[in-house]
């Protein structure tokens, strides 16, 4: 069995909770023979609270549900037009520490945005990726049994106004941005394959397979 191979699932537009549950079940059931996976998904509008999330950072959720998550970090928003990439990796197999994985995911986004002539950077004091002072990508992980789950959320072509109902990632007044501000044609469909390709490159080009859409 080719343990190094990574399977890539394209889940389309999905509610948050069933995907989160599936991710937990996958991680709990893993053993040393389980192949790593990358899940690409867009979510219906939802606020997710991180494990250390404080209720005061949810200002006026209104009609958007607030769901507790066990990832790191504070509250964020997911919605259509944002590409979420969940990384279900055996860190020992990949010879990665948690901090290295965070850096690798941030660099994946920086490299992807550079292909679209968008200059971006991570910040030491606030995980994620930024264009100037504005946040374009949120990041939150959980490690269980030496395996990662959760991942990143890149704003591409979405309605950003729900971010005004929260303090994104616990920072009051944090301004958000998205790829469409610089690249009007950008879409999750076109950006997702570039994200995956850049992540695989940083993982030293392991064999991979896109699974057929369900």
Curated annotation (Swiss-Prot):
UniProt record, GO biological process: protein modification process
Location in or out of the cell: Cytoplasm
Chain ranges of the BPL/LPL catalytic domain: 32-207
Enzyme Commission number(s): 2.3.1.181
Family membership noted in the UniProt record: Belongs to the LipB family.
More details: In the reaction, the free carboxyl group of octanoic acid is attached via an amide linkage to the epsilon-amino group of a specific lysine residue of lipoyl domains of lipoate-dependent enzymes.
Protein name: Octanoyltransferase
Organism: Klebsiella pneumoniae subsp. pneumoniae (strain ATCC 700721 / MGH 78578)
Name of the gene encoding the protein in the UniProt record: lipB
């Amino acid at each position: 069995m080719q343990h190094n191979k990574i399977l890539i699932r394209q889940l389309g537009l999905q509610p948050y909770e069933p995907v989160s549950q599936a991710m937990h079940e996958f991680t709990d059931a893993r053993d040393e023979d389980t192949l790593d996976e990358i899940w690409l998904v867009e979510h219906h509008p939802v606020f997710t609270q991180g494990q250390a999330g404080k209720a005061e950072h949810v200002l006026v959720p209104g009609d958007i549900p607030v769901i507790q998550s066990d990832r790191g970090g504070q509250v964020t928003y997911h919605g259509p037009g944002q590409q979420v990439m969940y990384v279900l990796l055996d860190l020992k197999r990949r010879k990665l520490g948690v901090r290295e994985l965070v850096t690798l995911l941030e660099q994946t986004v920086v490299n992807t945005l550079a292909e679209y002539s968008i200059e971006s950077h991570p910040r030491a004091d606030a995980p994620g990726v930024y264009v100037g002072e504005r946040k374009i990508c949120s990041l939150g992980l959980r490690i269980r049994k030496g395996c990662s789950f959760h991942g990143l959320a890149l704003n591409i072509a979405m309605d950003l106004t729900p971010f005004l109902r929260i303090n994104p990632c616990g920072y009051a007044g944090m301004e958000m941005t998205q790829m469409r501000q610089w690249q009007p044609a950008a879409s999750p469909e076109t950006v997702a394959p570039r994200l995956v390709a850049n992540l695989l490159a940083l993982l030293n080009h392991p064999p991979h397979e896109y699974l057929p859409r369900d």
